């Protein structure tokens, strides 16, 4: 009984990871891609995406769920890059400049995001999601109407022909892969962007260190139980705001790293999918709404992007249509988020029901404590 | 005076601002060369087009399931009904009603499974509904490509299979409701009688339903689940009913929208249609746990009025198209306002 239960807990906890490994393994042979190509792609994408995904960790520790509001940081980073291109600052200096511009904006946006989320406790995720849309409207307004009219843009080649507003696609030639190419390690036919990985490693060290600080401990306490933390004298609302600000700033830096690797910026929709991909990645890596680790991030990015690499070609081969592969990967991305959230909510309710049953004592016995009856009780008892 | 104050508080500042903004737009319209009669006609038309999808929000809000971000399931059921009706070559009123009848079983099945899922995740419905909706749309994208439809007006010409992204309903049931008993005044104003009657019929049925025994029980579940359970109401069953009704109304809503708009839009088209419906009912004064017919009426008129008037008036005023930005800010700002407000109310 107990062993079976353990096994079922294991499966329900790692269900998403297991499903993902299986789908990807099945899709590799029909895609016709060599293992070496897939590995190189994964290395590139680890460098490109890990930083963004790591930005999700702190809000999870603080009990605020998956921070869909990270898109705010991504927009701040894009504004920074637009100015870097405008002033013609190239190479890694351009990236640093973009970060310096993005930093105050992302701190401000993070603060706003924290305030809004404090007013919507228990609904942080959906609120963050909508807030990202809302700020997107302001971003569009700023980039499309303010830049070039209210704020003068020196570089006319990035401005729309009507005289104000930024062009739909911005060529980031001047800063393209400038972080990756500082030291490009070539080992056994693979190219590894060393500096990018060092930056990511430093962030990991920061996260580990931060968790041990007073603030980090407070954050975990708030994440466990807000009422208890409040009673223990921790400023709950402030701690939550700090968590979101750090996350937003990291997302700003992450988006700059992401875009320098991509090499061009879709001015008006590059940030649309940022939150979606980052959240999907961390969930694929086995994280949940309340638990996440650095390992989840790297496992998740690897698995998610392995599937993204193979699925269009596999779709082409299996169904004769690349579009099917494309739709399939989006279906899986959204589906993974949905399944993880469902499993998490379901587990929480089950745990609560079991706790209630154990309180009720001996006459019910442990026999009723597992599986379906307990779930039903959540609604009925 | 106190009455007035509480009224303002209940109604909420954002709505009042939007209302006056809309009035200002209407006042400005003639001065910038926008015809008022044509504008009114547009607003009425778009109100009818969208009202049923907004109405679909009501049952789930009432039963405590929150805003139905998973309305896409209903929309997809409607798309299935519409495409099947075209596939069966149903024309005219028969085609339109046929689409609704054909969509009904799908909406009930989707709604039932959707409700089962939502009952397992009480408290987290909104985020989950959103992602269930998205992933279902993506799943259906694959289905639209491989389902064996073969009506030449619907499939890609060169491949002979796979549905087109937009399908015209011109030869089938274009504007079948809009033109029913339509009253034409002058050159630019058309009163879409049939469309509005149809909307009124559904709103009336919903109003009746909310006052029936089941409807009252459903509202009780939304107001206080523990109390409802103590008085012998089956909470999960009531929630299931509300989700199925909501999904069904979503299906009817998109078919009504299509007959007026003229095209069936497939693939990823349903996903951007959900948020406007959510925003509209919130602009109308609903909160995430209370909604009424008045909210639907006021909200749809205000929101669609805004969508109709901002492009024409603001564009002629500023010589630039800011309507998209205004739409994004207003609709999402409204949802955000509702999400952050409930705490204050429950205190």
Segment roles from a protein language model:
Chain A
Residues 1-54, 91-93:
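Membrane-interfacial amphipathic/re-entrant helices at transmembrane-helix boundaries
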Residues 1-24, 224-231, 235-238, 300, ...:
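Cytosolic-side transmembrane-helix boundaries in multi-pass membrane proteins
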Residues 24, 36-87, 111, 116-122, ...:
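Single transmembrane alpha-helix segments in multi-pass membrane proteins
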Residues 73-77, 128-134, 294-307:
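Central hydrophobic cores of alpha-helical transmembrane segments
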Residues 90-136, 304:
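Alpha-helical transmembrane segments within multi-pass membrane transporters and channels
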Residues 135-211, 320-325:
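Transmembrane helix-bundle core of multi-pass membrane transporters
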Residues 188-266:
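Helix-loop-helix "hairpin" substructures at the membrane interface of multi-pass membrane proteins
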Residues 251, 255, 259-330:
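Transmembrane alpha-helical segments in multi-pass inner-membrane proteins
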């Amino acid at each position: 009984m107990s062993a079976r239960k353990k096994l079922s807990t294991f499966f329900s906890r790692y269900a998403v990871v297991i499903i993902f490994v299986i789908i990807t393994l099945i899709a590799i042979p029909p895609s016709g891609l060599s293992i070496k190509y897939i590995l190189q792609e994964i290395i590139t994408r680890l460098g490109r995406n890990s930083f963004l995904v790591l930005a999700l960790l702190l809000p999870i520790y603080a009990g605020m769920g998956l921070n869909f509001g990270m898109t705010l940081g991504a927009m701040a980073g894009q504004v920074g890059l637009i100015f870097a291109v405008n002033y013609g600052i190239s190479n890694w200096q351009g990236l640093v400049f973009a970060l310096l511009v993005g930093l105050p904006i992302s701190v401000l946006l993070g603060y706003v995001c924290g305030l809004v989320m404090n007013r919507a406790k228990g609904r942080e995720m959906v609120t963050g999601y909508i807030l990202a849309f809302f700020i997107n409207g302001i971003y569009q307004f700023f980039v499309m109407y303010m830049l070039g009219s209210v704020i003068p843009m020196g570089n006319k080649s990035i401005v729309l022909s009507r005289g104000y507003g930024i062009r739909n696609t911005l060529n980031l030639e001047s800063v393209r892969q400038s972080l990756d190419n500082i030291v490009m390690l070539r080992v056994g036919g693979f190219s590894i962007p060393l500096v990018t990985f060092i930056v990511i490693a430093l962030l990991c060290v920061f996260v580990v260190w931060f968790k041990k600080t007073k603030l980090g401990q407070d954050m975990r306490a708030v994440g466990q139980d807000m009422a208890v933390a409040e009673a223990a004298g921790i400023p709950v609302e402030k701690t939550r705001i700090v968590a979101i600000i750090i996350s937003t700033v990291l997302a700003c830096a992450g988006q700059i790293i992401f875009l320098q690797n991509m090499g061009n910026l879709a001015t008006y929709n590059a940030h649309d999918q940022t939150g979606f991909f980052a959240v999907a990645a961390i969930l694929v890596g086995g994280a949940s709404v309340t638990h996440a680790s650095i390992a989840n991030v790297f496992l998740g990015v690897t698995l998610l992007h392995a599937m993204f690499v193979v699925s269009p070609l596999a779709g082409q081969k299996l169904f004769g249509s690349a579009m099917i592969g494309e739709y399939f990967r989006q279906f899986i991305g959204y589906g993974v988020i949905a399944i993880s959230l469902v499993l998490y909510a379901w587990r929480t309710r089950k745990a609560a029901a079991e706790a209630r049953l154990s309180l009720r004592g001996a006459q019910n016995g442990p026999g009723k404590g597992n599986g379906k009856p307990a779930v039903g009780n959540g609604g009925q008892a | 005076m106190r009455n007035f104050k509480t009224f303002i508080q209940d109604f909420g500042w954002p709505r009042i601002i939007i209302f006056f903004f809309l009035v200002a737009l209407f006042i400005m319209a003639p001065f910038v060369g926008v015809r008022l009669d044509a504008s009114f006609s547009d607003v009425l038309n778009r109100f009818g087009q969208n009202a049923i999808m907004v109405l679909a929000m009501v049952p789930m809000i009432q039963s405590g399931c929150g805003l139905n971000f998973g309305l896409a399931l209903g929309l997809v059921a409607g798309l299935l009904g519409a495409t099947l009706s075209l596939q069966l070559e149903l024309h005219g009123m028969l085609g339109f009603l046929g689409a609704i009848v054909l969509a009904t079983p799908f909406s009930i099945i989707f709604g039932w499974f959707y409700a089962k899922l939502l009952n397992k995740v009480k408290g987290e419905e909104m985020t989950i509904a959103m992602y269930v909706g998205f992933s279902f749309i993506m799943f259906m994208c694959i289905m639209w490509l491989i389902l064996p439809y073969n009506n030449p007006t619907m499939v890609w010409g060169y491949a002979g299979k796979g549905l087109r992204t937009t399908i015209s309903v011109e030869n089938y049931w274009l504007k079948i409701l809009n033109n029913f008993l339509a009253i034409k005044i002058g050159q630019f104003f058309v009163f879409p009688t049939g469309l509005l009657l149809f909307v009124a019929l559904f709103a009336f049925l919903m109003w009746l339903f909310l006052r029936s025994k089941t409807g009252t029980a459903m509202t009780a579940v939304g107001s206080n689940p523990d109390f409802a359970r103590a008085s012998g109401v089956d909470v999960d069953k009531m929630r299931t009913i509300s989700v199925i009704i909501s999904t069904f109304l979503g299906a009817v809503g998109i078919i009504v929208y299509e007959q007026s708009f003229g095209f069936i839009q497939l693939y990823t088209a349903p996903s951007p249609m959900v948020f406007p419906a959510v925003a509209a009912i919130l602009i109308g004064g609903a909160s995430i746990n209370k909604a009424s017919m008045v909210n639907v009426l006021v909200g749809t008129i205000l929101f669609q009025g805004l969508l109709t008037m901002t492009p024409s008036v603001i564009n002629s005023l500023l010589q630039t198209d800011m309507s998209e930005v205004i739409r994004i800010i207003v609709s999402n700002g409204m949802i955000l306002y509702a999400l952050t407000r409930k705490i204050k109310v429950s205190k």
